[in-house]
Amino acid sequence: KPILVLGDPGQLPPIKGEGAFTKDAPDVMLTEIHRQAEESAIIRLATMARQGEPIGFGQYDTFVWKMRKMDVTPEQCLRGGQVICGLNATRLQLNNAMRRAAGFSDGWLPTGRGEKIICLKNQNDLGLINGMFVTLEDVVDEGSLYFSATVTDEEGNPIGRPGAEGNHQRLRIYKGHFEDHVAFDRHRHDRDWKEKRILTEATFGWAITGHKAQGSSWQNVIVWDDGL
């Protein structure tokens, strides 16, 4: 049977390889944008960026500015909504700076409520979805590979299997993604793959990459241009 394939030429390419259909020429291309106002600076600047056109510094409308990095402090980033960058190396640096600005400077493990944590792996049996933000409380270091914590979603609903006393069981969370913020090891995840299969995976979410941000929305964002 014929298959109708829809694609978005403005979507970020996969981290590895090519998109399944994007290497082929489309039969039809939709070019007129209806989702946002035609005069939206977001649409205009996004189109310029995709076409490789330079975007100067300054204010483009009531909602959009391009600022120099030296003019934006970690404290301002904390008040600016979600920070989005291109590279993982940038993400690690921004997370460290924003954690310090928020007062979480002791060690690389999350300390509990107030930390911005993002889930990195689907666990349908627990109600965890890759990309969702969660809150950790009562964090306990359990050894070399993981720590445990009670976990709630953004609405405050508990996450985990119900326990015998009516409360929800603590989750065991893989340390590696947090430890990468102070001692990056490119072989860590290959080395730990077998053990971490049964662990929850999460990391600091003060700053996230554009790939991780796809499909989400925020009231305000700061896009950190790192040349990706």
Summary of predicted features, one role per range:
Residues 1, 15, 226-228:
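Short, intrinsically disordered, charge-balanced linker/junction segments flanking boundaries
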Residues 3-169:
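Conserved helicase motor core of P-loop NTPases
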Residues 1, 80, 205-208:
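A generic hydrophobic-helix recognition signal that picks specific residues
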